[in-house]
Amino acid sequence: MTADTPTTADIDLIQRILPHRYPFLLVDRVRDIEPFKSAVGLKNVTVNEPHFQGHFPGVPIMPGVTIVEAMAQTAAVMVGVSADLADKNFLVYFMGIDSCKFRRKVGPGDVLELHVTATRGKPGAKVWKFDGRAEVDGELACECSFTAMMDLPTSPPGEAG
């Protein structure tokens, strides 16, 4: 982290940090990054997303697990920006999801605001814990706590280390 650490991440920076790509890249922008502490991700929900074909035909509802994944991706971007991990083959793995509650349906046309706050973890730590809240127009859609392991490989995936 430096004085030049960005407080936002556009889709280009997000893709330099996260390995996820369509159809599993679930955050479009991250703003209000407070290094190693918190951030707000934005996910523009569109009818073109593949999960809406089967969840549910005629009544498209974003699966709750994808909302939680979007919060986790927001947290990973916050840590990645804070630790200057763009282009460094940064991987993150779920370790646990706790106290998850869904409060509102999310569907096409909604903009998810993904508020994440680190409750455990510090620069260089492998295990982090976060509190997350997903909102649409200020209304709570989902809340949970989750634990993730941050992994910075010494060589790119698929290459011998």
From Swiss-Prot:
Active-site residue numbers: H55
Keyword match Amino-acid biosynthesis: no
GO BP annotations listed: fatty acid biosynthetic process; lipid A biosynthetic process
Cell compartment(s), UniProt: Cytoplasm
Molecular-function annotations in GO: (3R)-hydroxyacyl-[acyl-carrier-protein] dehydratase activity
GO cellular component: cytoplasm; membrane
Matches recorded under CDD domains: FabZ
Keywords: Cytoplasm, Lipid A biosynthesis, Lipid biosynthesis, Lipid metabolism, Lyase
EC number(s) reported in the record: 4.2.1.59
Lyase in keyword set: yes
Pfam families with a match to the protein in the record: FabA
Catalytic activity: a (3R)-hydroxyacyl-[ACP] = a (2E)-enoyl-[ACP] + H2O
EC class (word): lyase
Role played: Involved in unsaturated fatty acids biosynthesis. Catalyzes the dehydration of short chain beta-hydroxyacyl-ACPs and long chain saturated and unsaturated beta-hydroxyacyl-ACPs.
Family: Belongs to the thioester dehydratase family. FabZ subfamily.
Protein name, UniProt field: 3-hydroxyacyl-[acyl-carrier-protein] dehydratase FabZ
